[in-house]
Amino acid sequence: MPSFHNTITIGHRPNGDSKRTTYLVTGASRGIGKGLVASFLARPDSTVIACVRNVASQSKALSDLPCAEGSSLIVVKLDCAVETDPASAVEELQSAHNIRHIDVVVANAAIAGAYGPTSTLPLDAVKEHMQINCYSVLLLFQATRPLLEQAAPGKAKFVFIGAPISTITQMEECARAPLGAYGLTKLAANYLVRKFHFENKWLMSFVIDPGHVQTDMGDSGARLMGRKEAPTTLQQSVDGICARIDEATKEESSGQFLLHEDGSRLPW
């Protein structure tokens, strides 16, 4: 199995072929991120780049995922808490793996913590959430933009996995959730992703609400609200996200906040 500094390749060796579909997913070691990696790997002639915090300890679970004919998995270090990691990861993808274009970037990595009312919310916690949930999205876009530009015309997509708690219009529905730092920083990232849409006419850039998903993060949030678990299964969420990505167009999807289930638009 070929390996490089902070990266591992499994399956068909990428050769820079522009006809292959190349996906990049952050937060890929578990939950929605891992589910998306598995789904994309099941598609023939795909290169799937799974971004994780620690390649040595987190690549095994990903390397066991089945690959379709002609598809390959690249596991690369990208810790969203490290400001230089997005640029370093892209540099390594180009130099060590001959990645010449990316068709779809999914900014999925996120944290949710510092539970409690905003009256006692520590500023340090806000800063930590802002780095992971917002600043890293900007840095990821800046790092991957040149490779997105090399995708086939009308194919490049930058997708942010958002959260319904970030909507201002419908805040009353989620107001009792003690997730001020999470909601605030997801909201800030929404602005950036919509801004990418307006500033880059060649790019589809949009937010997908994945639902309240049965992941470690989702179930923790559910318990805070007195529920046993989140209502949306991981597979339901992943299937919906993939469908929204596949059907996306510049005219109908880009610059929007879309529900994973049916693509309906959510208010900002």
Curated annotation (Swiss-Prot):
A GO molecular-function term, please?
norsolorinic acid ketoreductase activity
Q: What triggers or suppresses the expression of this protein?
A: Expression is positively regulated by the dothistromin-specific transcription factor aflR.
Coiled-coil annotated residue ranges, if any: none
Q: Is the Zinc-finger keyword given for this protein?
A: no
Which Gene3D superfamilies does the entry mention? NAD(P)-binding Rossmann-like Domain
- Show the InterPro entries listed in the entry: Fungal_SecMetab_SDRs, NAD(P)-bd_dom_sf, SDR_fam
Q: What is its EC number?
A: 1.1.1.349
Tree of life domain: Eukaryota
Task: Tell me where it resides.
Answer: Cytoplasm, Cytosol; Vacuole
Record: active site: 182 (proton donor), 186 (lowers pka of active site tyr)
Principal localization reads: cytoplasm
List residues binding NADP(+). 32, 79, 108, 182, 186, 213, 215
Listed A to Z, the keywords are: Cytoplasm, NADP, Oxidoreductase, Vacuole
One Gene Ontology CC term in the entry: vacuole
The protein's annotated catalytic reaction(s) are: (1'S)-averantin + NADP(+) = norsolorinic acid + NADPH + H(+)
- UniProt pathway: Mycotoxin biosynthesis
Any single Pfam family the record assigns to this protein: adh_short
**What's this chain's function?**
Norsolorinic acid ketoreductase; part of the fragmented gene cluster that mediates the biosynthesis of dothistromin (DOTH), a polyketide toxin very similar in structure to the aflatoxin precursor, versicolorin B. The first step of the pathway is the conversion of acetate to norsolorinic acid (NOR) and requires the fatty acid synthase subunits hexA and hexB, as well as the polyketide synthase pksA. PksA combines a hexanoyl starter unit and 7 malonyl-CoA extender units to synthesize the precursor NOR.
Q: Which family is this protein grouped under?
A: Belongs to the short-chain dehydrogenases/reductases (SDR) family.
- Designated name of the protein: Norsolorinic acid ketoreductase nor1
